[in-house]
Every structure is written in structure tokens, then in C-alpha cells.
Amino acid sequence: MATTTATTSLLALLLLFLVALVSAGRDLVGDFLRLPSDSGNGDNVHGTRWAILFAGSSGYWNYRHQADICHAYQLLRKGGLKDENIIVFMYDDIAFNSENPRRGVIINSPNGDEVYKGVPKDYTGEDVTAHNFYAALLGDKSKLTGGSGKVVNSGPNDHIFIFYSDHGGPGVLGSPAGPYIYASDLNEVLKKKHASGTYKNLVFYLEACESGSIFEGLLPEDINVYATTASNADESSWGTYCPGEDPSPPPEYSTCLGDLYSVAWMEDSDRHNLRTETLHQQYKLVKERTISGGLYYGSHVMQYGDVGLSKDILFHYLGTDPANENLTFVDENSLWSSSKAVNQRDADLVHFWDKFRKAPEGSPKKNEARKQVLEVMSHRMHIDDSVELVGKLLFGIEKAPELLNAVRPAGSALVDDWDCLKTMVRTFETHCGSLSQYGMKHMRSFANMCNVGIKKEQMREASAQACVTIPANPWSSLQRGFSA
């Protein structure tokens, strides 16, 4: 009887407590059912959000990549992430570039906000390297060369978000200083990070041409990594908000302001309470917007790794802007606008041609712009012709096109021997000059040489015959070193 009375009294006290909470305006459902990582101030009780933002290019003609990264930084800060947990890699030659019509300002869309202010200068200039990227992700300060020294010092309950934007090619991603990021190396770093037990889940958003090849056949499904890419393994990604397109940048700009996949996920994130939107919902929305051009432009957004993680809400990785608290995600009214786009590999041509078009006739600016157009076109012709001739010397005139352009079955990695691929690239560049951002498109040809057993000495002889001289222009110069 005493036990029954005590139980009744306890229930009565609990009821009074709940009534008091309701009277105080508390959200009982939210309080009792809130997810472990839900925290209004962005500091997760059971873990920390970390982010690495990497712009892999330099040069004003590549404005859009650093604009993407700066936009992502502002989005994460509004979402509640702290500067100490956001690591930024960007060459930082855009905001105060002499060609920038708005000195000290970077925008990511025609009517967009200024996104450069406040962005941390963690790794800039020649410190933006694949080597430092890997060290920062692994939390290994001893392996850093230059930079702020900031690394992902994460623990087992933490969530990590990585966003990369730049040019790419089959199996590679660009880096403005030092060798490129190779798919095999990147995936090994991700596996090493998982083996260290220093994160709960990791999400990787990747903007680059042939970006699907970075993870296809390489990224395990059991290391708690979910990745989406701007394109599949054998197609270009696309720049957007470009001169002459609709919508175009303000008339004083001669360069694309953003990339189609990148602005798609960020403009969606800017407009919603990310507690109500999952990674999968955003993937579907971005996929639809990025392919909207059909046969004329656009690419196929892909997903890799632990696809089961896509059920997570974006809030776990990006936080959410308190101003969007009432902007619940709904598939039918997600406020995205169609925008024309330019193939990533041709976006620099858009810039140089726009400069030439706008320069006064007979002026020094006109002559300089003409020189730049001719140099970039000459370099492209040299690279294309040289790779084609190397192929003919190795395989014969009839077989070369098929062997150089062969695409492996879906789900297969680009190449079996990644060290061989690096050797082929370095040997070619020794005799023919830098591949540069444009030449990354030929990585599949070099990979196929490895896949059929071509040796370094054969490649050396063919490259030496194909390239008697290296063109004297900045694109072909090896001043910045080899790509491998």
C-alpha cells in the first residue's frame, strides 16, 4: 500500500513538473527526442563539427573556385561552426587581383553577397598543396609545410565535412602548388583517418571534371564516408554565372562566378532550415539542377561510399542559419533557378575572349589580351597533338584512338598501378611540358598506357620523338613543378 502511495505521489510530482515546463513554453517533443548532435549554438554535446574547404586553382580566370570556397565558409559560419574548426585552403590571389573590378570583394552569384570578408588564411599561396591537405585531414601537424598549422584535431564522435572545388581529370584533382591530388592517395588518406578512430561520419562534396573517378572503385562503403561528386567518372563539370550566359555576372566581370554543382548545394543550404533536410534530399535536388541542361550542358551528380549516411540531416555537418528556422525543406518548392553553364575546361577561354572583346582596338590591353588568347590556344593544341602522337607511336595509327580513350566498366578504378600513372605523367611532362589544368583531361590516356603494360622507357622514347620542343608560354612551363 505504501509503495502504491509513493508511486502515485511521484507521478503527481512528475505531472506538475511537465505542466510547469509547458507553461514556460518548452518544446517537450524537441527536448526529449532531439538528436544527439542537435545543438542550437552549433556546439554538439556529443561531438564537434569540422570542415576543410579546398580551392585547387589560382589565376583570375579561375575566380569561381575560390568564390565557391569563400561562400561555403560563410555558410558554415552562419551554421554555427567556429573558425577554429574550419580549415581553408585557397591561393588567395583573387580578391585583390588587378583584374577584380571590386577590390577586396568576392561574389559567388550575380546578385550575391560579398563572401571574402573574414575567411581564414590558413593555407594560401604555395602552401596550398596536396601534402598539406592530407596532413591537415589526418591531424598531423608534424607533416605540415607552412600555413597556420591548423589541422582537424577530431575525436571519435565528431562529424567532418570536406568541400573541394577546382579542375580535375580522370583520377586527379588540381592543386595550385606541387603535384596534383591523385585518387589513390586521397582514398588511402581517408582510410587512414578512419583507422585512427577520430571521426564518427565524414561527408565529402567534390566539384571537378571527371570527379566520379576519384571515388569509383576506390572508396570503401564501410568507413563512414559519404561522397557526392559534380560529375561521373568520364564527363566534365560546369562553371556557371559566366559572361554571355543567363544569368550573367555584372558587366564589369570577365569571368565565371561559380560552379553549377557548387552553387546548387550552397544556394539550397542558404535557403532552408538544415535540421529539416537530409543529405539525400539535397543530393536529389542538386542532381536535378546540375543536369538541367540535358544534351547541351550539365553533368550527372553521383554518390559513393556509405550511401546509408545520406539519411542524416545536413545540420549534423553544416549546422544551420538561425534566420532559416521557419524555412522547412519541401521538395516541390525548394527555390532553385535554372542557370546556363560553361564546360569547366572552356571557362578560361570565356575569360580571355571576354577580355579581348572588351579591350579598345589598338590599345596595349587589346594586344595583351590577344597574346593571352593565342598562348592558351597554342598550349591546348600542343597538348592534344602531343598525346595523340605519343599514342600513335606506342600503339600504331589505327589502334591508338581506341586504346587511349577506352573507358573501364562502371565500378572499376581508373588504373591498377597508380605509381605507373604518375610515372607516365612525369615522363610525358619532362619532354612535352606541363599538362596544366587543361591537360588533366588526358589522364585516362596515360592510365590506359599503364593498363596495357607500357613501360617507362617506351614512354620516354615516344615522348621524346613527339615533342622536339616545349612551347615558350606560361601554360607549358614546368616552373611550378611536375603534376606527379
Swiss-Prot record:
Enzyme class: hydrolase
Residues annotated as site: Required for post-translational maturation and enzyme activity: 256
InterPro entries xref list: AE, Legum_prodom, Legumain_prodom_sf, Peptidase_C13
CDD domains found in the cross-reference section: legumain_C
Signal peptide limits: 1-24
Propeptide residues, chain positions: 25-44
A single MF term (Gene Ontology): cysteine-type endopeptidase activity
Keywords associated with the record: Disulfide bond, Glycoprotein, Hydrolase, Protease, Signal, Thiol protease, Zymogen
One cellular component (GO) term of this entry: vacuole
Pfam families, alphabetized: Legum_prodom, Peptidase_C13
UniProt cross-references to Gene3D superfamilies, sorted A to Z: 1.10.132.130, 3.40.50.1460
Disulphide-bridged cysteine pairs: 242-256, 420-450, 432-467
Active site: 167, 209
Carbohydrate attachment residues: 326
Superkingdom, natural source: Eukaryota
EC number of the protein: 3.4.22.-
Family in the record: Belongs to the peptidase C13 family.
Function text: Asparagine-specific endopeptidase. Probably involved in the degradation of phaseolin during and after germination.
Full protein name: Vacuolar-processing enzyme
Organism, as annotated: Phaseolus vulgaris
